[in-house]
Amino acid sequence: MHPDVSADLSELDTTLRTVESVLDVEELRRRIDELEHQAADPELWNDQEHAQQVTSQLSHSQAELRRVEELRTRLDDMPVLYELAEDEGAEAIADADAERHSLREDIAAMEVKTMLSGEYDERDALVNIRSGAGGVDAADWAEMLMRMYIRWAEKHGYGVEVYDTSYAEEAGIKSATFAVKAPYSYGTLSVEMGTHRLVRISPFDNQGRRQTSFAEVEVLPVVETTDHIDVNENDVRVDVYRSSGPGGQSVNTTDSAVRLTHIPTGIVVTCQNEKSQLQNKVSAMRVLQAKLLEVKRKEERAEMDALKGDGGSSWGNQMRSYVLHPYQMVKDLRTEYEVNNPSSVLDGDIDGFLESGIRWRMRENQAS
């Protein structure tokens, strides 16, 4: 085996051992046994929300263990693969090199998962997208972003629940709120917070002029009972109205949509995607609790910044540029990570951006 290959495999082994240590593989196996025991309890589904949490955690833990075990097997097989390849010739060696490069990428992706250790990182994510400057193009852009994140979730087998979609008059959306239901989806998607900028030839401009549009992405952790975010009913004004679809058309004959206004903070939440008013109210309350938790977290961060004499982080402003004309490129303005295939990115292939963002955030946190 070539010395460079041997050194590379040794480096990969060191990285994978670190991943195995951080994940605590033996503890992960113990946790899976515990969750399997809970899942086998016939009374589990008496509480459907808890049952869904247990089955989701079990599925995620099993997948995580399977991934790290597969990586270990592939790495342990590499010396034998190269030994056989050297007997077979250049083409087999090229195949072995390709497997080694693929393995390096997969171990790096697994390593990123170990960087999600924040207080709320393992929670489900609540994503809110709002169109910004750019008129109808901005509304269309907001809908494109919504599709991008939902496609990303679907490709990973994650559940998505859309709580609210406020459609614009001509095309696109004014705003949308949806949950991505998978362990660590908040920690992963939270690096997407900020302003996303699109440059393209406007499909809505008869003269075919170039248009710059903006949309804002907000990502919050889904609130759990342990967060103690209690909402006084007297502080919330409840309004009901009929759900509307694209172009403002009514999609329901009853007043099933719900708008909650939290009077002390002025936070307004709407939900219209459920079939009943009660379901919409429950979903809207979840979103309101998540927003109130974020208010609490911002206050705590402001106190810490004041103690450190720090002006706070501004990374959540304009963070990524998507250029479709006059050239094709998507570039993260914080990490400098870029790709030249916007169509793939807009179809949900954003793992490279997520991984580079998580690594960037870790470096920023260490520096501060």
Swiss-Prot record:
The lineage of its organism: Bacteria, Bacillati, Actinomycetota, Actinomycetes, Mycobacteriales. Methylated by PrmC. Methylation increases the termination efficiency of RF2. HAMAP family: Rel_fac_2 (MF_00094). One of its GO terms (molecular function) is translation release factor activity, codon specific. This is Peptide chain release factor 2. Belongs to the prokaryotic/mitochondrial release factor family. The gene is prfB. One of its GO terms (cellular component) is cytoplasm. It is found in: Cytoplasm. Keywords: Cytoplasm, Methylation, Protein biosynthesis. NCBIfam families: prfB. It comes from Rhodococcus opacus (strain B4). Peptide chain release factor 2 directs the termination of translation in response to the peptide chain termination codons UGA and UAA. InterPro entries: PCRF, Pep_chain_release_fac_I, Pep_chain_release_fac_I_sf, PrfB. Disulfide bonds: none annotated. Gene3D superfamilies: 3.30.160.20, 3.30.70.1660, Release factor. The modification N5-methylglutamine is found at residue 249. Pfam families: PCRF, RF-1.
